[in-house]
């Protein structure tokens, strides 16, 4: 009947994530990052950008985006290590959905991405319809 303050905050955060979703696009290629940014902005997402893994980790910790799309092969800190560190920071409980993207679709890469904590693995070049299906499969409305 009565909700605790914690329940109200969690409900508020969940509703905010649904109504005003944000995405962190972590990609070292300017062209790919720009394409992904525009695609998400057209669907109403607020977009944070990172060009390397260290930036991605800092932005993710600070802003807690609704979704992360991360290239697995980035400078400074690669995508797998970035995801591993972020999952450690998140701890138990609700985890931010993560879509891994890579041009290096070699044997074992998908398994490594999923074992590290990514929810979905996509190969480059990015097909926007496939990305859209992936995002929707994670429970996002757009």
Give each language-model segment a name.
Residues 27:
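Conserved acidic carboxylate
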Residues 63-69:
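Active-site beta3 strand of CheY-like receiver
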Residues 74:
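Receiver (REC) domain active-site loop signature in two-component systems and cognate sites
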Residues 34-42:
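Charged docking surfaces used in two-component/phosphorelay signaling
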Residues 44-51, 59:
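Short hydrophobic/Thr-rich beta-strand motif most characteristic of the beta2 strand and flanking loop
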Residues 1-24, 129-142:
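Non-catalytic signal-transmission and effector/linker regions of two-component phosphorelay proteins
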């Amino acid at each position: 009947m009565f909700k605790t303050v914690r329940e109200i905050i969690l409900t508020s955060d969940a509703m905010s994530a649904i109504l005003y979703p944000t995405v962190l696009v972590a990609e070292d290629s300017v062209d790919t990052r720009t394409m992904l940014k525009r695609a998400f902005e057209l669907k109403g997402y607020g977009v944070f950008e990172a060009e390397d893994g260290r930036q991605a980790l800092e932005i993710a910790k600070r802003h807690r985006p609704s979704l992360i799309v991360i290239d697995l092969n980035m400078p400074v800190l690669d995508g797998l290590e970035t995801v591993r560190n972020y999952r450690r920071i998140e701890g138990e409980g609700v985890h931010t959905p993560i879509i891994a993207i890579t041009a290096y679709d070699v044997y074992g890469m998908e398994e490594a991405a999923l074992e590290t904590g990514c929810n979905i693995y996509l190969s480059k070049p990015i097909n926007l319809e496939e990305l859209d299906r992936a995002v929707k499969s994670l429970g996002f409305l757009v």
